[in-house]
Amino acid sequence: MSLVGGFPHHPVVHHEGYPLRRRRCRRRRRHPLRPRGEPLLHGWLISSHPEMSPPDYSMALSYSPEYANGAPGMDHSHYGGVPPGSGPPGLGGPRPVKRRGTANRKERRRTQSINSAFAELRECIPNVPADTKLSKIKTLRLATSYIAYLMDLLPKDDQNGEAEAFKAEIKKTDVKEEKRKKELNEILKSTVSSSDKKTKGRTGWPQHVWALELKQ
């Protein structure tokens, strides 16, 4: 006798010669209209005892401890179904994680190559103190000034291209400002030595000095 409704339970015949997968296929063939996850007890009760009403069926399910409490053993895989999360990625399964380390690796290599190139350029500049940290802009400025110094030494033979004569000026200077100051000093010296007469225009400064200032 079965616990479900007091009806006799039909014996289940197990065929040991068939594998488990073939038995699951035969179960699915016997019940093609059974939805996934629904126990086989529903079809057995409806087909064997059509006089049972839905309330009696729900009461019969409550008598079974496996169906009432939701035992962990009663999952979809027990009835031939597929457990959630184990299917392919397009059917709700775990999606593969995309690796985005390629772009970061390329950027890291590019930064390392630039830093190594600037380090080699700093070693080529002479007369730089060892404890001085040069930025990239200062390194480029000193390199250009050293190249200009070497170009000036080409037509001369007095220093024979000695690198010790080059002075690395680390102070921040503006080339345009220095050039403007030199031009003003030369103009002032020429005007004072040539004549002492007063010129028309603004007093205190020569007229061409003011013209030069206005052009800036």
Curated annotation (Swiss-Prot):
Q: Which PANTHER family match?
A: BASIC HELIX-LOOP-HELIX TRANSCRIPTION FACTOR, TWIST (PTHR23349), HEART- AND NEURAL CREST DERIVATIVES-EXPRESSED PROTEIN 2 (PTHR23349:SF41)
Function recorded in the entry: Essential for cardiac morphogenesis. Binds DNA on E-box consensus sequence 5'-CANNTG-3'. Plays an important role in limb development, particularly in the establishment of anterior-posterior polarization of the limb bud.
In which domain of life is the source organism classified?
Eukaryota
Location comes to: Nucleus
Subunit (UniProt): Efficient DNA binding requires dimerization with another bHLH protein.
GO molecular-function term, one example from the UniProt record: DNA-binding transcription factor activity, RNA polymerase II-specific
Keywords for this protein: Developmental protein, DNA-binding, Nucleus, Transcription, Transcription regulation
The entry's protein name is: Heart- and neural crest derivatives-expressed protein 2
GO biological processes: heart development; limb bud formation; polarity specification of anterior/posterior axis; regulation of transcription by RNA polymerase II
Q: Where does the protein principally reside?
A: nucleus
* Domain bHLH stretches: 98-150
Compositional bias (Basic residues) spans?
96-111
Q: Where is this region: Disordered?
A: 74-115
Query: Kinase as a keyword?
Result: no
Per the UniProt entry, what species is this protein from, by scientific name? Answer: Gallus gallus
Pfam families this protein is in?
HLH
Q: Which GO terms describe its cellular component?
A: nucleus
InterPro entries the record matches:
bHLH_dom, E-box_TF_Regulators, HLH_DNA-bd_sf
Q: Does the keyword Nucleotidyltransferase apply?
A: no
Q: Which SUPFAM superfamilies match?
A: HLH, helix-loop-helix DNA-binding domain
